[in-house]
Amino acid sequence: MFEETIKKQFELLDISNFNVDISHRLLFVCGGKVDVRAPIPPSFRDRLLTYTAKNASELHEHFILAETFKDYFKENAYPDLLVFEDDIASISSLIIIFLESPGSLVELGIFCNKSELFKKILIVASAEEVYGEDSFIYLGPLEYIKKKVSSSVVIYPWPDPEVLKYDNDFLDDLCVNIKEKLSSIPKTEQFSKDNSGHIALLITEIISLCAPIQLSEIESALNSLGINISTKIINRSIYLLQKVG
């Protein structure tokens, strides 16, 4: 009975009139190790997190760490890393990649082939590596991305992992670059049923309007809007939404 009511209500709506509110910023941050117990931050990413916690809370509160999703395979939410990366990129306002770990180089390789995402990617690279002789990273992916969207790559001298002191001016400048990058990203978008981030946010709205609601009823609501996706994809979206809060 409730499912029939849902169908009737959502059949009255036209998704071509939908706009997506993306003003709530989600900043996906991946890179080197983070260890709050370490006397010296083990990575540049860790230093940014420590710095923003004290000096730029307006950014810090929107950070989502890659480690948040380390159980994605245990939960059977995603079949592989590529599908997960597509979804997290779609729902994120900005993807910040510190090139300081094998995992971050994998991230770079994945996103380098998705030029439509360059506007929402910020790659933080080591000056020592970039300006090093015959730097493959600079001559290859970074140079390619910079030619497409120059604001997508920033370069800083890397902190010494064995020295506590580091010039906070670099961290402050990085925060400025993050804010400038965010300011260039619109706060609303035309809804697209091919955008997994838009689908996830639509599912949030359906749950909010119809709670308590079952998985099959969410699927019925989407079907009534002309969006035919499997319960597996709905489950993926719900997993992602739960993780980002």
Say what each PLM segment does.
Residues 1-245:
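Conserved catalytic or regulatory cores that recognize and/or transform ribose-phosphate-containing ligands
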